[in-house]
């Protein structure tokens, strides 16, 4: 039976250069582990959760996504590319040793100047009844009253605490010592923590929405119907099993055939540039990364941009260091098994795979490491297409762009290049490589995505690879993958269904008020800073005043005609999952490329409501932690509940707000002005002062060793997030203290706990980061992450906090109250 597919038009009709405005301001999602490029300069790559979920599809998600879910995709990669290296820069589960049993209800004692100070947070004799523990649905569905919600929260907090631990020795152990025992890592995950727990709750809600019957009044052109059809097609395993690999084989044939499957493949007609452009139309960047995004030096203008490629393993070191040989061998075995499932003989698959791996290893050698790409001002080169062709004459850039842009491209067209040396080295490498190997590699990177849209034989092979790479013991249930796919690719349609049923406007207004208070705290701290000159301080104040905040959701998602317009050219059928995915990828590519010629509209939403995370965009000077988060996103426990004591809300979502504000002034955010443009606006004196204080944090975190795997944290790569963590908690606590002074009569305690409001602030902050991760995933994250492990986000931040030391009466010189502290903001 001949299966249908969406063909690539090799000679598309031209479109006029001036594009009409679109309501998508961001469509491209980077390769989640290989460190791809600068494409996200305009996006929210400074996120709060970060890179804690290494099992997230390695480079399977290296395609356009409507709503860039960077909860782990900040990107997983080392930044072999500009953007991934600077995932927080450019503009986007905690390591914990399982503890022994604890004594419920114990108080602890410490000595301050030989005086015993009792700081019992858990009431004596308090016990926990697991049967009474509510799931997160109870919270965000609005069930319960003040008393019941607070009782439930107290039980949860007590459940995770190790009350035998001394908070002045190790506050993470004190706050989270029972987490691992109470929450073993599920077999389908590489790690498990608070965020993953929230996501599972959210995914269950989204599944219910997607499975609800389609109202009879809606037709197939309705965006929410298309989202439901996409979910149905993904879940219809009987059809997937019947079709097997045929849809992919047909598509590969249309693309010229995958040599590994075709011994008769003819190299004479092979055109690597054409195939690269064809794959780009399916939102896949291989060899060269191309995208349309705001110019980092003129954030109001969209421009074509190029950068180095991503790779198929987490970092270039996986290809280049002998210590990673086991992972490279597993990668090759994965490739061979996929090829044989698609019909290759074992002999041919093995021979071709060895050639392909050798080529990708050479490719890794010409990519730049993250350390080499820290100064993105030096990487930035703006030029015309004609000038680029002069510098790299082996590539017909006009032809490539004419295919991708679906219009004639002139030599005068401006482009920004972030990896000129890489591109020049690439064409030399290609000239020395057999066409068969290049074709094999290009299509392997494409096939690796597309097998996710086939039957479970391919998922079983991928699971074996992921077990070696991340330690994940089994693949997630199909419904979880399907929910993720629909929410990533049709996030606004899903968000429309979600917001109509669950969004809480009161939470939105309350959070906005908190944000204003925390912004005020930052301004006060900034004004008291002695190491910044007055002129720089004035400009920084202007920047924080200009910082915008998006809360909730864009209005258009509740207006069916506007929402339907967004997806009008996307054809979705309930029984064609493979073709549906291709249609979406092509749609997202068109939308992205169509941005060229338009002025950047910084008020547009590019994130969907139903996601758990928070973000700061340097190019827009904008916090959008809530555009993706609504009530079943990050505005739910432990971050927020309208019935919580204010201490928990400030220690939860308040710290998130402060974290994102501080990203505007971290090691990369400070380079962008109030309008989101990259230029030198700090005085030399202020720059020197910043570097001195940032170096203190770099050195501090670099001393932390993750005992489970015997590896140290990379203090340089994590500095931006560490700066944001340390600044965020200071601002949030300052705002909370002000609220306390104005609301002395409010009850800031929890039933069954004797903790003060200020103690609960820090305890809730710490419990946000309770979690554990498999050793394999831990090793990978320490090599690639821009966030410190959760344990050290707690210890590192609180050991620098004078407020924490005072609230918990920690003696000077104790581990959580060192004499020498680090502080930037």
State where each predicted segment sits:
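Hydrophobic/aromatic-rich, well-ordered segments within soluble, folded domains that form packed cores
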Residues: 160-182, 317-341, 719, 725-731
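Active-site-surrounding "flap" and adjacent substrate/cofactor-binding loops of secreted or lumenal enzymes
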Residues: 149-150, 166-169, 174-240
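Long, low-complexity intrinsically disordered regions of secretory-pathway proteins
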Residues: 2-136, 719
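Intrinsically disordered, low-complexity linker/terminal regions across diverse proteins
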Residues: 356, 362, 382-397, 402-409, ...
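Short secondary-structure subsegments characteristic of cysteine-rich extracellular domains
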Residues: 188-210, 346-366, 649-655, 754, ...
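Noncatalytic, helix-rich "gating/capping" subdomain that lines the substrate-entry/channel surface
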Residues: 205-518, 554-557, 566-567, 571-592
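Short, Gly/Pro- and small/polar-rich lid/capping loops
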Residues: 139-159
């Amino acid at each position: 039976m001949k299966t249908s597919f969406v063909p690539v038009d090799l000679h598309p009709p031209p479109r006029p250069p001036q594009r009409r405005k679109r309501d998508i301001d961001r469509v491209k999602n980077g390769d989640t582990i290989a460190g791809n490029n600068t494409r996200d300069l305009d996006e929210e790559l400074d996120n709060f959760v970060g890179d804690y979920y290494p099992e997230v599809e390695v480079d399977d998600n290296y395609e356009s996504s409507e709503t860039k879910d960077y909860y782990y995709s900040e990107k997983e990669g080392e930044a072999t590319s500009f953007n991934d290296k600077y995932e927080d820069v450019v503009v986007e589960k905690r390591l914990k040793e399982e503890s022994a049993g604890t004594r419920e209800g114990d108080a602890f004692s410490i000595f301050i100047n030989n005086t015993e100070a009792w700081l019992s947070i858990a009431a004596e004799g308090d016990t926990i009844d697991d049967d009474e523990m509510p799931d997160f649905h109870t919270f965000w569905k609005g069930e319960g009253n003040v008393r019941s919600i607070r009782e439930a929260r107290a039980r949860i907090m007590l459940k995770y605490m190790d009350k035998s631990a001394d908070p002045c020795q190790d506050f993470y152990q004190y706050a989270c010592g029972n987490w691992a025992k109470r929450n073993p890592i599920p077999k389908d995950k590489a790690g498990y923590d608070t965020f993953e727990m929230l996501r599972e709750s959210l995914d269950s809600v989204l599944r219910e929405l997607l499975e609800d019957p389609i109202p009879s009044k809606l037709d197939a052109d309705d965006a929410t119907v298309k989202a439901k059809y996409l979910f149905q097609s993904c879940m219809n395993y009987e059809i997937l099993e019947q079709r097997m690999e045929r849809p992919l084989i047909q598509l590969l044939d249309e693309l010229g055939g995958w040599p590994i499957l075709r011994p008769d493949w003819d190299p004479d007609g092979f055109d690597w540039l054409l195939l690269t452009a064809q794959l780009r139309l399916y939102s896949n960047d291989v060899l060269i990364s191309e995208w349309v995004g705001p110019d980092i030096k003129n954030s109001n203008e969209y421009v074509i941009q190029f950068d180095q490629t991503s790779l198929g393993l987490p970092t270039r070191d996986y290809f280049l260091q002998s210590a990673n040989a086991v992972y490279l061998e597993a990668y090759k075995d994965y490739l061979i098994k996929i090829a044989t499932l698609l019909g290759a003989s074992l002999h041919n698959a093995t021979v071709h795979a060895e050639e392909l791996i050798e080529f990708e290893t050479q490719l890794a050698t010409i990519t730049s490491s993250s350390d080499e790409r820290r100064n993105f001002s030096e990487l930035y080169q703006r030029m015309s297409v004609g000038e680029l062709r002069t510098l790299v004459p082996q590539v017909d850039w006009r032809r490539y762009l004419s295919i991708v842009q679906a219009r004639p491209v002139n030599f005068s067209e401006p482009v920004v290049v972030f990896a000129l040396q890489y591109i020049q080295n690439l064409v030399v490498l290609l000239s020395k490589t057999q066409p068969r190997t290049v074709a094999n590699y290009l299509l392997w990177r494409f096939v690796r995505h597309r097998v996710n849209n086939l039957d479970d034989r391919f998922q079983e092979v991928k699971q074996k690879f992921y077990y070696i790479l991340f330690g994940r013991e089994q693949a997630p249930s199909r419904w979880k993958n399907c929910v993720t796919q629909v929410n990533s690719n049709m996030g606004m349609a899903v968000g429309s269904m979600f917001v109509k049923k669950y969004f809480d406007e009161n939470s939105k207004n309350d959070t906005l008020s908190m944000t204003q208070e925390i912004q005020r705290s930052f301004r006060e701290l900034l004004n008291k800073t002695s190491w910044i000159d007055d002129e720089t301080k004035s400009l920084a104040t202007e920047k924080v005043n200009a910082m915008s905040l998006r809360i909730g959701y864009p209005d258009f998602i509740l207006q069916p005609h506007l929402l339907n317009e967004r997806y009008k050219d996307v054809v979705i059928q309930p029984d064609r999952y493979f073709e549906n995915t291709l249609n979406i990828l092509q749609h997202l590519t068109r939308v992205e490329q169509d941005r060229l010629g338009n002025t950047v509209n910084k008020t547009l939403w590019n994130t969907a409501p139903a996601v758990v995370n928070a973000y700061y965009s340097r190019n827009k000077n904008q916090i959008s932690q809530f555009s993706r988060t609504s009530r079943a996103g990050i505005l739910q426990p432990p971050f927020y509940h309208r019935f919580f004591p204010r201490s928990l809300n400030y220690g939860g979502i308040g710290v998130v707000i402060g974290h994102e504000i501080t990203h505007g002034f971290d090691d990369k955010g400070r380079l962008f002005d109030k309008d989101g443009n990259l230029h030198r606006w700090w005085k030399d004196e202020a720059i020197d002062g910043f570097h001195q204080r940032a170096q203190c944090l770099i050195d501090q975190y670099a001393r932390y060793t993750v005992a489970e795997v015997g590896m140290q944290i990379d203090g340089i790569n994590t500095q931006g997030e560490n700066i944001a963590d340390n600044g965020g908690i200071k601002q949030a606590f300052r705002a909370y203290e002000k609220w306390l002074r104005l609301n002395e009569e409010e009850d800031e305690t929890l039933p069954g706990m004797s903790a003060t409001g200020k103690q609960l602030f820090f305890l809730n902050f710490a419990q946000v980061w309770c979690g554990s991760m498999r050793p394999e995933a831990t090793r990978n994250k320490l090599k690639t992450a821009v966030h410190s492990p959760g344990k050290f986000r707690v210890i590192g931040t609180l050991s620098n906090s004078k407020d924490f030391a005072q609230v918990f009466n920690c003696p000077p010189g104790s581990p959580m109250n060192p004499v020498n502290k680090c502080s930037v903001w």
